[in-house]
């Protein structure tokens, strides 16, 4: 099993200048070479990443410094991304600053369009390429969210 080695976050606001990049070292000796290859890192590089507790503490602190109120976890693939962020926060920190809920971008866009099948059409609003670099991917998602907001969906930011 491969737990995600890297993750990125961005505060959704017009400048998109507040970003976070976390790289966690493995927590298991088991790993999948094909899955790790997507990250662009070798197993040897992955072993040099920071301890998960340190990364998650830094991420929590970054959220506290950059987000007003409780942060909202919004993702392209919420079911995948949420499970491990939630686990890491609870296991290493004892709580998750996002609480117990999140939003999937495709569902937000489907609601705006009133079309269940519009769930992947929002991706056309990304300006930053979806490269699987976590910060690039988060920036592209945030760009799309800003456009979706311009199209009329109300957001708390």
Predicted feature descriptions by range:
Residues 72-78, 83-84, 119-157:
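Acidic, Mg2+-coordinating catalytic module of metal-dependent nucleases/exonucleases
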Residues 88-92, 111, 147-151:
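Active-site catalytic microenvironments for nucleophilic, acid-base chemistry
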Residues 79-100:
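Substrate-recognition/cap helix-loop segment adjacent to the acidic, metal-dependent catalytic center
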Residues 92-96, 114-121, 152:
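Substrate-binding/catalytic groove segments of enzymes
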Residues 24-26, 30-32, 36-39, 43-46, ...:
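Active-site-proximal helix-loop-helix substrate-binding element of RNase H-like nuclease domains
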Residues 1-79, 124:
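Conserved non-catalytic scaffold segment of RNase H-like nuclease domains
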């Amino acid at each position: 099993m491969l737990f995600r080695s890297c993750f990125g976050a961005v505060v959704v606001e017009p400048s998109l200048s507040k970003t976070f990049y976390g790289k966690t070292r493995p927590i298991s000796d088991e790993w999948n070479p094909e899955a790790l290859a997507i990250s662009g890192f070798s197993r040897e590089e992955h072993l040099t990443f920071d301890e998960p507790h340190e990364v998650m503490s830094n991420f929590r602190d970054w959220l506290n410094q950059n987000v007003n109120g409780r942060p909202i976890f919004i993702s392209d693939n919420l079911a995948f991304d949420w499970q491990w962020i939630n686990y890491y926060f609870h296991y290493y920190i004892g709580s998750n600053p996002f609480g117990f809920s999140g939003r999937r971008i495709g569902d937000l866009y489907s609601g705006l369009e009133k079309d269940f099948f519009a769930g992947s059409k929002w991706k056309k609003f990304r300006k930053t390429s979806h490269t699987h670099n976590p910060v690039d991917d988060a920036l592209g998602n945030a760009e799309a969210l800003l456009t979706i907001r311009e199209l009329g969906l109300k957001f708390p930011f």
